[in-house]
Amino acid sequence: MQAINLTDHFLIAMPRLEDSFFAKTLTYICEHNEQGALGLVVNRSTDLSVEKLLTQLGMSPQDPALSNLPVLLGGPVQVDNGFVLHEPVGAWRFTLSSNVVTGLTASIDILQAVADCQGPEKILVALGYSGWAAGQLEQELAQNAWLTVPAQSRILFELSFEERLPAAMKLLGIDFFNLSNEVGHA
């Protein structure tokens, strides 16, 4: 069996995940290899704005637009830790590159740069991440828990969090409300 690599892809939760954390989620896969996968849910916001988060961290945000940018709930793992998905990649401490332009950073230096208007051009800030052990994501895919599609920067950074899942579904030519809870194999 050939290994798949879903780095820089979206995972679209199938309706059968209705009762789980991942119900109706769109997850961006930042890294996927033989050791497992790491991603961020990109369509579930918290009640916290990026401006409030930075202020709570003792920073003085300079950009008023940060008050309208919600902090996302990136996943059920390490929900007390912040993660910044951004373009361009840049030279931050603790950055994982998903592709040549998109990075995931988990260090305070990028948040300070955002507060000082010196950060990356495009950002999503999340608390927590989504993680899969080796082979776990592949098993969930075989059980029809997810649809996959190559990610698009436009969906991540230009659409509101509410618009992201329908836009990713549209890439597959599918309306989310037409999906069935039933699975089958041809």
UniProtKB/Swiss-Prot annotation:
Pfam families per the UniProt record, alphabetical: DUF179
Top-level taxon in the UniProt lineage: Bacteria
One GO term describing the cellular component: cytosol
UniProt xrefs under PANTHER family: UNCHARACTERIZED PROTEIN YQGE (PTHR30327), UPF0301 PROTEIN YQGE (PTHR30327:SF1)
Family: Belongs to the UPF0301 (AlgH) family.
Classification via NCBIfam families: PRK00228.1-1
Protein name, as recorded: UPF0301 protein Neut_0448
UniProt organism field: Nitrosomonas eutropha (strain DSM 101675 / C91 / Nm57)
